[in-house]
Every structure is written in C-alpha cells, then in structure tokens.
Amino acid sequence: QIGDNCSIGSNVVIRNSLIKNNVHILDGCVIGKKGFGFFPDKVSNFRYPQIGIVIIDDNVEIGCGSTIDRGSLSNTIIGKNTYLDNQIHIAHNVKIGENCIIAGQVGFAGSSTLGNNVMIGGQAGISGHLKIGSNVQIGGGSGVIKSIPDNSKVMGYPAKDLKKFIRENK
C-alpha cells in the first residue's frame, strides 16, 4: 500500500510494505525483500522466517540505491520526517525514530533501534540488537558496537564519546 503524494523513482522494487503519505523513494531502491538471517547447522543453513513488513511513515525521503529489508518476526519501521541519503542498508527489524538524518553508505545490522532526532555521518556501521537513544549524533566512519544513551555524541571505531575521541586523536 502506497499513500498520497508519494513519488517512486526508476528501477525501484517494493514488496511487503506500507508506505504512508509524502514519501519519496529515489531510483534503484529495494524495499521489503527478505533479510539476511539464518540458523547455522553443521550440514546446512536454514533461513529465518521473514514475515514482517516495512512501514515507512509520513514525510520520508529514501536516497538512491538504498535497501530496507522486511522484518523477520516483527516489522522494520522508518519514522516520520526521516531522511536517508544514498546507498543505505537497513536490515530486518530495525526501527528508526522520527526526524532522523542518515548520511550515505550507513549500514544497520538487524534489530537495532534508533530514537528520535538522531544524526549519523556517512559510512558509519551500526551492529545488531543495539539501542541508540534520542538526540544522538554519530560521526562519519564510526563503528557502533554497543548501545548509546540519549543526548550522546560519539565517533570512532569502536564509537566512543566525541570529547574522548578528540583528546585521544590530537
């Protein structure tokens, strides 16, 4: 289902999704396909069921070449007024809050949650099953491997408090 006043670019694939109003999806995006999740076994690997959907709330823009996986057992959600730059990957069950700005080539592993008003610089990576609080800023190229509390500014690999990062890298 696609809401009112939406635009869909060329070569976009949309499946298993609910797209609300004023959403703009630029060229080459793939939204709602199954995510990457397996039960490892000594003989073979078995895929997790992928039965959730992608929900994209009002006033969202998704840049060229971005991919958003459907949820496995819950939904993948993009909150209102969020802007995703080009070539972003959002894995299954990720929940992004409202008013977020995410720069190009950011990757989210499965089941992480972002609060509201989060800004993430380009080429940052967010590991799976983390909670990123509201009003957080993550510097470009950072590797986030643990949860981040509200109102934090972090940078580096592994991501650490911005003031500490600056002191250590003078």
Residue positions per predicted region:
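Structural signal for interior beta-strand "rungs" in well-ordered beta-sheet cores
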Residues: Q1-D161
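Long, leucine- and charge-enriched amphipathic alpha-helices
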Residues: I166-K170
